[in-house]
């Protein structure tokens, strides 16, 4: 008992012609395969064939070709409904009532069709089909809208008789249990796309499906299939509309009329095709994230890869009067290294917002006459002072670069493969074997900046921190009379004498709960850990400056207990305001009772700021002397320890391995840095490489260990990138020549 669904396909530039009744009868027998409909139903009823439909079978299908504007191809829209009990085909775009035609005279009907055709030139029509097994057929109407008008403005009629809904309310229970697929709306590149989902039992809302075929990336010869199912308020299917094939020319981006719209069956309000889909449920409000500029100021994630080594070559000396020249294949060049260098001119990680991938060059391949390949180009990642380098995989701190000019080797390049000249021996004077270059290490790296400032200015929002920085340095931060004016840390250099300077950082304001993520201060609290001295600015115009001072101190302690142990200076600001002057004595007495001597200033009038600068510099000199003594005691720091660890792993012996057995698949995995590196550098295009690999497995004890663990014939053995099938026949696993070869063929040269 599925009522008809309204389908609108707009064609702006070409007239639309209705098929006559006789033409429709003729087209039923030659129904196009592209126009076949597929109801989105788990167990659809049997569909009538085209021949049975033409002979007066139970089902009826109409299809209409709508030419798109500026497109040589066309759109085929198919309406499919379930078979009816009436054997007469009911495919018609004209109004029917109780299953009968309005006019008994066929000539009158043809005249009416001609009138409709003339009246709808340049417009689009949509058809409504009668209900399945409906005793009265329902009231079905025809509506249209002008193609030159926007769809939501030109719609003339979409009314379906309320009898359809009333009839569906009386449907039997067994038919209510009929499960069909439902559709939802998903945003696309241009427009929206309809996709099918299984319905929920409690979901009784009607679905409105709006499909816009204008998508980026589709060429003229590509196709898109869209299917829509309308549901009644009780959940059973009304009708199915399918856009089987769509071909269009997307050169004209202004063609907004080529659309297929499926409307509510019982909603008289216009459906806005171009507006967002509105389902009466309230959308969840997402918190606004940190802006990209702030997020990338002191954190970044980059990808670094060292260069692969060049391949060795197989070559022989061919020279006049030298009949037995011997092997002359050269070794491949070493891959480029990845360095991390501190650039004193940088003060943020914003350059890494667009530059993410850093790849060193690959070593050149070897050549004849024992010519080794050239080394790959190195790549240098420049970072500001105070950058911490961590591994993104394990969150392990790798490096901490503090001073400008520091340079650390992060990833060493891969070793070049050996040519056949390196495999020459007394028993093998003309080797036909060479190695591939070693792959360079790669990793994702997290960069975190902790500004290297001598003095850090902290405090509540709108306390006058930026104003103080402007008064004591040449920095020009944004200053305004509202909280959170400072969104990013600002740096300024304070000069006392010709050779006495200090760097001062103005940090964003702190709120109560900043250590848990409230406000903006928690994003930049890490920068205060680098500061030798903290200047705590208190807003004297506040109602409770004592409470503000204690709250900020508590937030610093909760974020990092080491911040409380740092020397700090308390500055009472805005003494130019009367209310601040009135509260100064009370604030001073409270802090003096705790052993703290505060300073009162007016940063706006630059009164009292010199005393603050001298006090901070005095504390800074003591801290610099302490750090210098510690550095002389501990000695210079090794910045290449990450590369040294990679080199040690490369020198791992081949006899250090582990074997893991997967009983479900009878797979034996041999894991070891040395044996896996051997497999990766083996060039399998040479027959001698396989013999060398078989001997290596025997020499390092892999075969012996597998036999002890109970490997059986037919099991799979995986060593690095090589996968083999184990066999007990010695003739298939190794040859006599391999057994007689020397162990020198599997040894590695020292890493250089």
Curated annotation (Swiss-Prot):
GO terms for biological process: chloroplast organization; embryo development ending in seed dormancy; response to light stimulus; rRNA processing; thylakoid membrane organization. Residues 740-752 have a biased composition (Basic and acidic residues). Its cofactor is Mg(2+). Transmembrane segments: none annotated. InterPro entries: G_OBG, GTP-bd, GTP-bd_Obg/CgtA, GTP-bd_prot_GTP1/OBG_C_sf, GTP1-OBG_CS, GTP1_OBG_dom, GTP1_OBG_dom_sf, OBG_GTPase. Residues 103-117 have a biased composition (Acidic residues). The keyword Metal-binding applies. Residues 1-90 form a transit peptide. Probable GTP-binding protein that plays a crucial role in chloroplast development and is required for leaf greening during plant growth. This is Probable GTP-binding protein OBGC1, chloroplastic. It comes from Oryza sativa subsp. japonica (Rice).
């Amino acid at each position: 008992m599925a009522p008809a669904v309204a389908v609108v396909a707009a064609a702006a530039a070409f007239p639309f012609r209705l098929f006559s009744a006789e033409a429709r009868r003729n087209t039923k027998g030659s129904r196009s395969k592209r126009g076949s409909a597929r109801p989105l139903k788990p167990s659809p009823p049997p569909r009538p064939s085209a021949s049975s439909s033409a002979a007066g079978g139970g089902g009826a299908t109409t299809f209409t070709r709508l030419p798109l504007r500026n497109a040589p191809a066309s759109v085929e829209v198919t309406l499919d409904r379930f078979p009816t009990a009436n054997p007469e085909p009911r495919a018609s775009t004209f109004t029917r009532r109780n299953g009968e035609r309005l006019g008994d005279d066929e000539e009158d009907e043809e005249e009416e069709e001609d009138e409709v055709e003339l009246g709808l030139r340049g417009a689009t029509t949509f058809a409504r089909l009668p209900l399945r097994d409906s005793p009265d057929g329902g009231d079905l109407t025809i509506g249209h809208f002008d193609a030159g008008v926007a769809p939501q403005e030109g719609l003339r009629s979409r009314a379906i008789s309320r009898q359809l809904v009333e009839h569906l309310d009386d449907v039997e229970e067994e038919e209510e249990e009929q499960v069909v697929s439902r559709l939802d709306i998903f945003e696309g590149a241009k427009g929206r796309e309809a996709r099918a989902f299984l319905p929920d039992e409690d979901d009784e809302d009607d679905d409105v499906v709006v499909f816009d075929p204008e998508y980026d990336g589709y060429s003229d010869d590509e196709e898109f299939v869209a299917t829509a199912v309308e549901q009644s308020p009780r959940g059973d299917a009304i009708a199915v509309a399918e856009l089987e094939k769509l071909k269009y020319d997307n050169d004209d981006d202004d063609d907004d009329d080529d659309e297929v719209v499926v409307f509510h069956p019982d909603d008289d309000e216009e459906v806005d095709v171009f507006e967002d889909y509105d389902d009466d449920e309230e959308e969840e409000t997402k918190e606004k994230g940190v802006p990209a500029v702030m997020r990338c100021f002191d954190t970044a994630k980059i990808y670094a890869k060292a260069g692969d080594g060049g391949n060795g070559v197989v070559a022989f000396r061919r020279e006049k009067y030298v009949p037995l020249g011997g092997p002359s294949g050269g070794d491949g060049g070493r891959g480029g290294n990845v360095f991390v260098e501190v650039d004193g001119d940088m003060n943020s990680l914003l350059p890494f917002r667009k530059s993410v991938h850093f790849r060193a060059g690959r070593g050149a391949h070897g050549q004849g006459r024992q010519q080794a390949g050239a080394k790959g180009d190195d790549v240098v990642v420049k970072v500001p002072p105070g950058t911490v380098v961590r591994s993104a995989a394990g969150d392990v701190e790798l490096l901490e670069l503090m001073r400008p000019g520091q340079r650390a080797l992060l990833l060493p390049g891969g070793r070049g493969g050996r040519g056949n000249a390196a495999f020459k021996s007394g028993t093998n004077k003309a080797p036909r074997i060479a190695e591939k270059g070693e792959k360079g290490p790669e990793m994702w790296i997290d960069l975190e900046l902790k500004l290297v400032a001598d003095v850090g200015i902290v405090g509540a929002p709108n306390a006058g921190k930026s104003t103080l920085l402007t008064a004591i340095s040449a920095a020009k931060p944004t200053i305004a009379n509202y909280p959170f004016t400072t969104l990013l840390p600002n740096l300024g250099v304070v000069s006392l004498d010709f050779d006495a300077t200090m760097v001062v950082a103005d940090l964003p304001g702190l709120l109560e709960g900043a250590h848990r993520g409230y406000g903006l201060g928690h994003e930049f609290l890490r920068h205060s850990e680098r500061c030798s001295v903290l200047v705590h600015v208190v807003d004297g115009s506040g109602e409770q400056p004592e409470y503000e001072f204690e709250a900020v101190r508590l937030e610093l302690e909760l974020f990092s207990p080491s911040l409380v142990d740092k020397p700090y200076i308390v500055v009472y600001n805005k003494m130019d305001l009367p209310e601040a002057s009135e509260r100064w004595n009370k604030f001073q007495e409270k802090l003096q009772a705790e052993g703290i001597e505060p300073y009162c200033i007016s940063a706006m009038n630059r009164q009292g700021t010199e005393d603050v600068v001298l006090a901070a510099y005095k504390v800074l000199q003591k801290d610099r002397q302490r750090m210098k003594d510690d550095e002389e005691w501990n000695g210079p720091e090794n910045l290449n320890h990450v590369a040294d660890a990679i080199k040690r792993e490369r020198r791992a012996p081949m006899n250090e391995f582990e074997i893991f057995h997967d009983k479900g698949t009878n797979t034996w995995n041999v894991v070891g840095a040395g044996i896996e590196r051997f497999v990766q550098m083996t060039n399998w295009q040479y027959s001698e490489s396989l013999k060398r690999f078989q001997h290596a497995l025997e020499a390092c004890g892999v075969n012996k260990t597998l036999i002890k663990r109970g490997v059986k014939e037919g099991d799979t053995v995986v060593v690095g990138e090589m996968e083999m099938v184990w066999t007990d026949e010695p003739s298939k696993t190794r040859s006599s020549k391999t057994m007689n070869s020397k162990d020198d063929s599997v040894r590695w040269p020292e890493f250089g």
